Amino acid sequence: MKTPRIPIAIQQAVMRSLREHLAKANLKLERRYAEPTLVYQQRGTSAGTAWLEKNEIRLNPVLLLENQQEFIDEVVPHELAHLLVWQHFGRVAPHGKEWKWMMENVLGVPARRTHRFELDSVRQNTFPYRCRCQQHQLTVRRHNRVVRGEATYRCVHCGDLLVAEK
């Protein structure tokens, strides 16, 4: 799927959110952390990721277009908090007490680990498989492993080997 173009007004709103939250953190922590790079190339069902060593935030352009305000209010500070925690505390648990503190006490944003966005537009195709008790949906990756003979999968309920439906 081709990466959609993000309108300049949305990019500006995202950048404004990033800069406002970074300024708040720099003020409260009495530091001058560098502004991270924003990249709109995150794929799959992740809303965003923080690349610690690169000081980079990657955002999912499809989910951003579908959930603009939530990205500005929640996703941007969420990923920024990961970068700030890494720079301030070093290597710690990704959503541990330091991250929660950074989100709530420094950035003033509720600390939620996962988003609740509708994912139909970014979800991968699945392939129907069957056992003796039900139908299963395998991802493209798992289906291809079966086709190449690299893997087999069993039902967690009945233990039967999953077989592709015709």
Curated annotation (Swiss-Prot):
<dbReference type="Pfam" id="PF10263">
    <property type="entry name" value="SprT-like"/>
</dbReference>
<feature type="active site">
    <location>
        <position position="79"/>
    </location>
</feature>
<dbReference type="InterPro" id="IPR035240">
    <property type="entry name" value="SprT_Zn_ribbon"/>
</dbReference>
<comment type="similarity">
    <text>Belongs to the SprT family.</text>
</comment>
<dbReference type="InterPro" id="IPR023483">
    <property type="entry name" value="Uncharacterised_SprT"/>
</dbReference>
<protein>
    <recommendedName>
        <fullName>Protein SprT</fullName>
    </recommendedName>
</protein>
<keyword id="KW-0862">Zinc</keyword>
<feature type="binding site">
    <location>
        <position position="82"/>
    </location>
    <ligand>
        <name>Zn(2+)</name>
    </ligand>
</feature>
<dbReference type="GO" id="GO:0008270">
    <property type="term" value="F:zinc ion binding"/>
</dbReference>
<keyword id="KW-0963">Cytoplasm</keyword>
<feature type="domain" description="SprT-like">
    <location>
        <begin position="19"/>
        <end position="164"/>
    </location>
</feature>
<dbReference type="GO" id="GO:0006950">
    <property type="term" value="P:response to stress"/>
</dbReference>
<keyword id="KW-0479">Metal-binding</keyword>
<dbReference type="InterPro" id="IPR006640">
    <property type="entry name" value="SprT-like_domain"/>
</dbReference>
<feature type="binding site">
    <location>
        <position position="78"/>
    </location>
    <ligand>
        <name>Zn(2+)</name>
    </ligand>
</feature>
<dbReference type="Pfam" id="PF17283">
    <property type="entry name" value="Zn_ribbon_SprT"/>
</dbReference>
<dbReference type="GO" id="GO:0005737">
    <property type="term" value="C:cytoplasm"/>
</dbReference>
